[in-house]
Amino acid sequence: MPVALPELACYGLAGHTESPRDLLVECAEAERVGIGSVFLSERFNVKEAASLTGAAAAVTTTLGIATGVTNHNTRHPLVTAAWGATVHRLSGGRFALGIGRGFDFLFDAIGAPRVTLEQMEDFVGLLRRLWRGETVLGHDGPAGRYPYQIGR
């Protein structure tokens, strides 16, 4: 196997796909030729990043795995934090969670809030708190409101 080049990355499973299983071959081949990382994206109707990153980790041993980018505003921070921690451990520390603004027209179409820089900053803060073992109950900020509720 050639020496991996950490500064060289590829975009895995580009665009729309008929079969997400194609990613398994792409990742194995990228690792074989010495590519340092694979970046994975989401498409609301055909690609879900949590599944793809776990699959990439399962078929590689040295390839870095990153989202470029994930639609963080469509997931609860608890779900995103659990996903990030799980794939980080599953991959032996090779996972990086990339978040970004996405496309307003898609969020408008599904009724999700548009992403702002303030929301992204707040979301990252929530992830850091969760990864430190803290709670987000009672949080009320740009990334969302997570009140503490006992019963209903």
Predicted regions and their residues:
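Ser/Thr-centric signal marking residues that sit
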Residues: T60, T67, T74, T80, ...
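Active-site-proximal loop/turn and secondary-structure-junction residues that shape catalytic pockets
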Residues: A14-H16, F44, N71-N73, R101-F105
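Alpha-helix N-cap and loop-to-helix initiation/capping positions
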Residues: E18, D22, E48, R75, ...
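Internal, glycine-rich beta/alpha segment that forms the wall or movable "lid"
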Residues: P2-V3, V79-R152
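Short amphipathic alpha-helical segments at helix-loop
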Residues: S37, G68, D108-A112
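N-terminal beta1-alpha1-beta2 module of alpha/beta enzyme domains
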Residues: M1-T67
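A short, GP-enriched loop/loop-strand-helix hinge that lies immediately N-terminal to
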Residues: G64-T70, A96-L97
